[in-house]
């Protein structure tokens, strides 16, 4: 344990030193590093595929569940996507050094704000090798240093990616310690990382609810996180049914295992008799199990009874909870009680109800007449994202480059002194 503690503190010390160099780096230098990493990823395609094959073989040997195995796979297309993602990040505006909100004070001084890096970011994630590259790219562009602790299932691929990232940093004369991958699979390393408040400024966990709850409870450093994605679609009394069908189909059935997939359907009572049968028939035709309230079951004989727990549940499966509500008031109250504050959508032609939904629903993304699946950094024009935050302080919603920065006040004067 002492060896792990010493190893992690060494990583932290090196990251803190590197963060100062990254904060000074200009946009051209950072973009040069990103493009060099992208080039090396394409060149080392065979190395990465071999490393991933070794990880997959070990994972199968240890009985890793199919869903995790699926996330672990790195394909030829996945390698191209990683490289393209870095090039896209290089093409994004650099937020560092951006100045705003300048105003003169009666004393003669000028006050404004400057956007600066957070410093050292610890990122903890499970079996997705692409997160290593996405996280490294976003941290480099935003002028931060990163300590990456990927899942033990992907250790061979992550080590290979770390070598590639270091090559790209060196090509731009940036310190290799600006991006460090934790080389040990010992879980004690996570415990050390989340308590190194002298070296690490923020932790970003990406993974299952159990991992994120543990980190949130034990960290001594601020955490940017979301626990789960219990997202809702509410069909208002004025909804266009054709729109509602398209939006619900995409929100629930496009991909079952994502955090922005709809897990609960609410329908206004005044249109339930007209809307619920076709909405649920569409879902059932896609293999989705309906778990509904008594009013839902009266209209949809195939529906199973919904429990209180169902309304809190992120299924990540072909299941949806359904409830008939009186109106937009009850829909908002239900969502604010049961949701995970991730993403909620209303389908409505009523401007007043849409405005109320936007103002009163307490989630990180609130959507009118579009799919919950749009809650994504790429779709929001942020480029890649490091995660989604359902917290209210610092970053909220998809966390891209700007979410990895902070603001400091700057004061400009010409010899003024305080009276």
UniProtKB/Swiss-Prot annotation:
| UniProt KW DNA-binding keyword | no
According to UniProt, this protein's pathway is: Amino-acid biosynthesis; L-proline biosynthesis; L-glutamate 5-semialdehyde from L-glutamate: step 2/2
Reactions accelerated catalytically = L-glutamate 5-semialdehyde + phosphate + NADP(+) = L-glutamyl 5-phosphate + NADPH + H(+)
Among its keywords, does the record have Amino-acid biosynthesis? yes
Report keywords, A-Z. Answer: Amino-acid biosynthesis, Cytoplasm, NADP, Oxidoreductase, Proline biosynthesis
The EC number(s) given in the record are: 1.2.1.41
Q: Where are the transmembrane segments?
A: none
Molecular function terms from GO: glutamate-5-semialdehyde dehydrogenase activity; NADP binding
Provide the protein's localization.
Cytoplasm
GO cellular component: a single term: cytoplasm
UniProt cross-references to InterPro entries, sorted A to Z: Ald_DH/histidinol_DH, Ald_DH_C, Ald_DH_N, Aldehyde_DH_dom, G-glutamylP_reductase_CS, Glu-5-SA_DH, GPR_dom
Report disulfide bridges, numbered on this chain: none
One Pfam family in the UniProt entry: Aldedh
A single GO BP: L-proline biosynthetic process
In terms of PROSITE patterns, this protein maps to: PROA
The similarity comment for this entry is: Belongs to the gamma-glutamyl phosphate reductase family.
Q: What does this protein do?
A: Catalyzes the NADPH-dependent reduction of L-glutamate 5-phosphate into L-glutamate 5-semialdehyde and phosphate. The product spontaneously undergoes cyclization to form 1-pyrroline-5-carboxylate.
- Record's protein name: Gamma-glutamyl phosphate reductase
Which lineage is the organism of this entry classified under, starting from the top rank?
Answer: Bacteria, Pseudomonadati, Pseudomonadota, Betaproteobacteria, Nitrosomonadales
């Amino acid at each position: 344990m002492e060896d792990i503690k010493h190893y992690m503190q060494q990583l932290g010390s090196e990251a803190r030193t590197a963060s100062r160099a990254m904060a000074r780096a200009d946009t051209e230098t950072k973009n040069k590093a990103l493009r060099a990493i992208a080039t090396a990823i394409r060149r080392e395609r065979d190395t990465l595929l071999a490393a991933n094959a070794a990880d997959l073989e070990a994972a199968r040997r240890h009985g890793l569940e199919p869903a995790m195995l699926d996330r672990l796979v790195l394909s030829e297309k996945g390698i191209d996507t990683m490289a393209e993602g870095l090039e896209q990040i290089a093409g994004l505006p650099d937020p560092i050094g951006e100045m705003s909100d300048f105003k003169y004070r009666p004393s003669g001084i000028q006050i404004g704000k400057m956007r600066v890096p957070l410093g050292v970011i610890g990122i903890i994630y499970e079996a997705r090798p692409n997160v290593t590259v996405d996280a490294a790219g976003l941290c480099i562009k935003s002028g931060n240093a990163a300590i990456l602790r990927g899942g033990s299932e992907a250790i061979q691929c992550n080590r290979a990616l770390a070598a590639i990232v270091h090559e790209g940093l060196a090509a731009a004369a940036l310190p290799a310690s600006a991006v460090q991958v934790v080389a040990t699979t010992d879980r004690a390393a996570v415990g050390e990382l989340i308590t190194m408040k002298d070296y690490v400024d923020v932790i970003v966990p990406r993974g299952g609810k159990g991992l994120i709850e543990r980190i949130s409870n034990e960290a001594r450093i601020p955490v940017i996180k979301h626990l789960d994605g219990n997202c809702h679609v509410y069909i208002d009394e004025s909804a266009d049914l054709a729109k509602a069908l398209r939006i619900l189909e995409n929100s629930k059935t496009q991909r079952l295992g994502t955090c922005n997939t709809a897990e609960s359907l609410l329908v206004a009572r005044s249109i339930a008799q007209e809307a619920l049968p076709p909405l649920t028939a569409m879902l059932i035709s896609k293999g989705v199990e309906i778990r509904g309230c008594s009013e839902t079951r009266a209209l949809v004989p195939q529906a199973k009874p919904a429990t209180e727990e169902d309304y809190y549940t992120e299924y990540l499966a072909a299941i949806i909870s359904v409830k008939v509500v009186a109106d937009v008031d009850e829909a908002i109250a239900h969502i604010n009680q049961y949701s995970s504050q991730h993403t909620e959508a209303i389908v409505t032609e009523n401007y007043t109800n849409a405005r109320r939904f936007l103002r009163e629903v307490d989630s990180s993304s609130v959507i009118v007449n579009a799919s919950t699946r749009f809650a994504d950094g790429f779709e929001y024009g942020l480029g890649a994202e490091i995660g989604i935050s359902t917290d209210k302080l610092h970053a909220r919603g998809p966390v891209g480059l700007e979410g990895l920065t902070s603001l400091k006040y700057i004061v400009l004067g010409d010899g003024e002194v305080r009276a």
